[in-house]
């Protein structure tokens, strides 16, 4: 079971928190194309613990994309890094780095690297994907995978390219992800469009829910909400989830080199 800590970089691992559904069919999103981001994009997210209306900064995450080559093929090298602030380091220090080498045409990953230190618990895993032979070779062995397999980081960029106009409210959008040498059959539930106020400002946004795993610090079920910008960037704006006391809020607080103007922004806070 995938564990999530209060100060873990929830942004990078938002798609780790879904409940696996082993009987779900393979998703039909092979062949998706990138229409939302470009090389050079950088996004800063801040993690807050909120209780009684107060916001306490707990950590920070960054996502960057650069153009690279992998085995002679053009790829997006996407990196997600996160850390807790010094005050929270005294309780639970987090230093995480996730990397993915993503095919520029198919948005499928060739390689995924996870190098994390969470409260002194260190994990390193290096996974190479063969999307044609349907295998994933990790630090621990070779595993069979399904079509159009995603990793943690590539899943974030994949989700930004979903065409939500094709869906009705409460539709489930499935995809497969490989993590910790296991395949997870995941989905998000589309909840429509609305205005959202964050610590950055006010936006027109698209809202959806992941289904959380029971037994983590989060409540089981569809308690987590996420919002992306209702413009061609589909930029992640906010993630919000209740915990046993208070809630965790992750807000986009900075960006550069977006592919399109952030037209969803109504006003800056």
Spans of features found by a protein language model:
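Hydrophobic h-region of N-terminal signal peptides that target proteins for export
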Residues: 11-20
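Bacterial N-terminal signal peptides that target proteins for export
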Residues: 1-8
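Hydrophobic, well-structured mid-protein blocks that either form specific transmembrane helices
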Residues: 121-163
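Acidic, serine/threonine-rich low-complexity disordered tracts
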Residues: 21-129, 167-269
């Amino acid at each position: 079971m995938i564990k999530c800590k209060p100060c873990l970089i929830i942004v990078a691992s938002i798609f780790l928190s879904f409940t696996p559904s082993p009987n779900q069919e393979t998703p039909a999103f092979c062949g998706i194309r990138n229409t939302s981001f470009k090389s050079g994009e950088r996004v800063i997210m801040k993690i807050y613990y909120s209780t009684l209306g107060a916001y306490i900064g707990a950590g920070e995450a960054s996502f960057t994309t650069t153009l690279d080559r992998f085995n002679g093929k053009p790829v997006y090298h996407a990196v997600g890094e996160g850390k807790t602030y010094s005050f929270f380091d005294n309780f639970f220090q987090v230093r995480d780095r996730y990397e993915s080498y993503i095919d520029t045409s198919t948005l499928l990953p060739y390689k995924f690297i996870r190098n994390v230190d969470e409260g002194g618990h260190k994990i390193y895993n290096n996974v190479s994907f063969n999307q044609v032979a349907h295998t994933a070779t990790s630090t621990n062995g070779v595993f069979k995978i399904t079509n159009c397999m995603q990793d943690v980081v590539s899943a974030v960029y994949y989700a930004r390219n979903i065409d939500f106009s094709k869906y009705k409210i409460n539709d489930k959008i499935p995809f497969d992800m490989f993590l910790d040498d296991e395949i997870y059959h995941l989905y998000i539930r589309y909840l429509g469009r609305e205005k959202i106020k964050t610590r950055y400002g006010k936006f027109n946004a698209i809202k959806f829910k992941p289904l959380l795993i029971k037994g983590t610090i989060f409540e089981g079920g569809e308690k987590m909400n996420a919002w992306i910008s209702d413009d061609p960037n589909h930029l992640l704006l906010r993630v919000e989830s209740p915990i046993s006391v208070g809630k965790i809020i992750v807000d986009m607080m900075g960006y550069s080199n977006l592919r399109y103007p952030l037209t969803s922004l109504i006003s800056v806070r």
